[in-house]
Amino acid sequence: MNKIVLCLLVFCVAHSAAYDLLKAPSYFEDFLHKFNKHYSSESEKLRRFQIFQHNLEEIIIKNQNDTTAQYEINKFSDLSKDETISKYTGLALPLQTQNFCEVVVLNRPPDKGPLEFDWRRLNKVTSVKNQGICGACWAFATLASLESQFAIKHNQLINLSEQQLIDCDYVDAGCNGGLLHTAYEAVMQMGGVQAENDYPYEGSDGNCRVDVAKFVVKVKKCYRYIAVFEEKLKDLLRIVGPIPVAIDASDIVNYRRGIMRYCSNYGFNHAVLLVGYGVENNVPYWILKNTWGEDWGEQGYFRVQQNINACGIRNELLASAEIY
């Protein structure tokens, strides 16, 4: 077969724009099998199909309108947007807040840096994790940045314990949500954080079992950033390291690949890690690490267009920390 024809066939099969709303029942049965979905009753199955059909319609519209990204049926496709956000994100204002972190206003014009930069290429980013049904994105994003700080300083990748923060951070609310800077403050108050192997992830709230003798990372100081110019995040990323950021995750749920040019910003509900940036077909983009597993997006990552405040990425909830 002609190689060009073969490539076109592969592209057509792979591209989610090929979805047909009339085939929703067939897609749904495939979805049930692929993701091993089971429901308590036929009425619940019907309800889930109706949600699935609504999500499929949204996926088709997105694939028609967003020419630089692709969207697909995935493990969240039988959940409403509100369900996905409530179960799989977790950025929320704690009942009590503190202010240990120094506030830095990024109001100077950006420097002339490289067009592309990616901390993954320098082997300073740990593997993608999966928070599961626990609203602890705040813990994953903050500790992912500390993991990178440790790798930058000691040239060694180590996985830290999100479960320690979920169980022992009494400012944030465990699987019910938290913030980025308050998580850093909690690590400072506790004195450090253990490795994941010593305090494994359980995906639910538990009793604090912290062992100070097993701390592997200690935080010296934390910072909150107010970015006046989105472009300035490039300088911050290169100088500081991977940065946890707050976003609105509503539009990334059914993301598959490419650069998202349309991502709403109706309120922050999720935290992810900014690890790099680049340009593809003259479209500048940010690279972000998510916590929904490697079977989501671009092996757990996603890209959004720069300088349009995609998903609300430019906000006052940016944070980072300096380790000993």
Swiss-Prot record:
This is Viral cathepsin. Synthesized as an inactive proenzyme and activated by proteolytic removal of the inhibitory propeptide. It comes from the Viruses. It is an enzyme of class 3 (hydrolase). One of its GO terms (molecular function) is cysteine-type peptidase activity. Belongs to the peptidase C1 family. Residues 19-113 form a propeptide. The keyword Disulfide bond applies. Glycans are attached at residue 159. InterPro entries: Papain-like_cys_pep_sf, Pept_asp_AS, Pept_cys_AS, Peptidase_C1A, Peptidase_C1A_C, Peptidase_C1A_papain-like, Prot_inhib_I29. SMART domains: Inhibitor_I29 (SM00848), Pept_C1 (SM00645). CDD domains: Peptidase_C1A. Residues 1-18 form the signal peptide.
